[in-house]
Structure formats: structure tokens, C-alpha cells
């Protein structure tokens, strides 16, 4: 059955966080779990690829408890191989990606300050594509105005496309870097006040997806280096790769109400 097939030592990890004596805890873990035999005919764990797509994939769903129309536009790209995540270039690329997300979100927040904003909410993200381990994605998530769904799409898509085509400015980059440094400095200052959950999360990310575990001091040192050496040209070049007009998937959740007119899939595709 499912339990016997997948709950086995070679796919599991024991994570212990707290004020412990490491040698004693390690010995106890080995004593409790060390004699569990490996499965003779273990099923291979396969990370299935997510295919690329030329034409946008559109999926919609209605729910009576969904209060507004929420759109999620994904732009897929291949993941960084686990073996490359220990390289300093991975931390540098992640730093530039976070700058791009920060600057685009600042632009979207500025639009939302209008007297009548074109959308109810809008944020940009970067990370795992749904539950896939073979694709990551840049994502635009936005709440649409019921009386002007197209206007909401137009505003969000136009802002991301403007960033892709023309990039960001030196002043935008400087402000984003200042925000990043403040976060890194705060994390360093609070490094001795972390709750156990923080360390558990870091260990889980390392075990499940090979995310590197670095100290707050190391991260702060690297961010200072990146702030001095990363250029606007490099960030704008990375933005062109992250924000793409290819490999797009649009997922829309809408209210299940007679008065709400959900556009057809073809119409939603044209909006983008």
C-alpha cells in the first residue's frame, strides 16, 4: 500500500532542533532507527517533468465561497539543479531575483495608491511552480475588479511587461537594495532570538530541495558584496529571463454567483 511503498528510511529524515547534546541525540536516533532495513524492491521516486507550452494554458474554477476573482499568471522555467545550489552564484542569482520582485511589487503598490486602483490587489512572486520539483515560475497574483476585469488584467500585465522590456532604474535598484540590506541586518541582529520553527523550516528546505543553509553573518556579508558588485544591467538582464511571454499558465478562481460574468478561456488568454 501507499504507506509501505513510500514511508521508508531512504526517503525520510529525522530533524531535531533545540537545546540538545548532539552526540547523545545522534546516538539515540541511530539506536531507534538504525536497524530498519532498506526495502529490497523499493519504488523509484521520480520527479516527473512539466512540459513546456507555446500556447498559454488557461484553467478556471468557480467557488461559492470565493469572494473575488483571483488570477494567477505563471511563467515557468527550469529549476536550478540541486547540485548547483551550493555554489555562491545561486545565492547571487536569488539575490537579484528578490530585487526584481521587490521593484515590481513597489510599482504595483504605487498603482494601488490611486483613488480608484485598477485592481483590488496585486503582487509578484518567484518560486516553485505549484507542486512541481522540475519547474519554478515567476507569478503575478492579482484580484480583479468585478466591474472591469479586463482593466485589472491590463494594468498588471502592462506593468510586468514594462519591466521586462525596459527594465528598472538606478534609483529603483538602490531602494530595493536598501530594503534587502535592512532585512539582512535585522536577521543578523535577531540571530540569537530565533524560535525552533525557523531552524526546522531551514532544515526541511535543505532536505527536500537542497536549499543551502547559511548563517545570518554569512548572508549579510554576501549581501554587502552583492550590493557593491551587482549592476543594473545584470538585474535588467535577469528580469528579461524571469518575466517571460512563453511557458505561461493562467489559473483563475472566481465567485460562483449568477451576477458574476466570468470571461471565457479564450477571452482571458487575449487579456494577457
Model-derived regions, located:
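Non-catalytic beta-strand/loop surface segments
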Residues: 1-11, 35-81, 90, 94-150, ...
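Non-catalytic, conformational "gating/processing" segments within enzyme and secreted inhibitor domains
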Residues: 2-30, 246-248
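Extracytoplasmic/secreted cell-surface and envelope-processing proteins
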Residues: 22-26, 82, 260-262
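Short secondary-structure boundary/capping segments
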Residues: 29-35, 266-270
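A common structural junction motif
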Residues: 32-40, 158-168
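Acidic/histidine-rich, surface-exposed loop or edge segments in extracytoplasmic proteins
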Residues: 135-137, 214-220
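Segments forming glycine/polar-rich beta-alpha architectures that bind adenosine-containing cofactors
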Residues: 230-231, 238, 242-272
Amino acid at each position: 500500500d501507499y504507506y509501505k511503498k513510500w514511508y521508508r528510511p531512504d526517503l525520510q529524515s529525522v530533524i531535531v532542533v533545540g537545546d540538545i547534546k548532539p552526540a547523545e541525540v545522534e546516538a539515540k536516533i541511530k539506536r531507534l532507527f538504525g536497524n530498519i532495513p532498506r526495502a529490497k524492491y523499493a519504488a523509484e521516486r521520480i520527479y516527473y517533468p512539466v512540459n513546456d507550452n507555446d500556447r498559454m494554458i488557461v484553467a478556471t474554477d468557480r467557488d461559492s465561497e470565493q469572494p473575488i476573482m483571483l488570477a494567477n499568471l505563471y511563467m515557468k522555467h527550469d529549476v536550478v539543479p540541486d547540485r548547483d545550489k551550493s555554489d555562491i552564484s545561486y545565492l547571487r542569482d536569488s539575490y537579484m531575483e528578490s530585487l526584481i520582485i521587490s521593484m515590481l511589487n513597489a510599482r504595483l503598490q504605487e498603482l494601488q495608491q490611486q483613488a480608484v486602483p485598477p485592481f483590488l490587489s496585486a503582487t509578484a512572486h518567484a518560486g516553485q511552480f505549484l507542486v512541481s520539483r522540475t519547474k519554478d515560475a515567476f507569478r503575478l497574483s492579482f484580484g480583479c475588479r468585478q466591474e472591469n476585469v479586463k482593466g485589472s488584467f491590463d494594468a498588471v500585465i502592462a506593468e510586468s511587461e514594462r519591466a521586462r522590456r525596459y527594465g528598472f532604474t538606478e534609483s529603483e535598484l538602490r531602494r530595493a537594495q536598501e530594503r534587502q540590506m535592512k532585512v539582512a541586518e535585522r536577521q543578523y541582529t535577531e540571530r540569537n532570538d530565533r524560535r525552533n520553527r525557523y531552524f526546522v523550516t531551514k532544515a526541511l528546505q535543505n532536505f527536500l530541495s537542497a536549499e543551502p543553509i547559511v548563517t545570518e553573518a554569512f548572508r549579510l556579508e554576501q549581501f554587502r558584496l552583492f550590493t557593491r558588485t551587482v549592476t543594473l544591467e545584470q538585474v535588467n538582464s535577469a528580469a528579461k529571463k524571469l518575466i517571460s511571454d512563453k511557458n505561461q499558465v493562467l489559473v483563475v478562481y472566481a465567485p460562483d454567483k449568477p451576477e458574476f460574468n466570468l470571461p471565457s478561456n479564450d477571452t482571458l488568454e487575449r487579456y494577457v
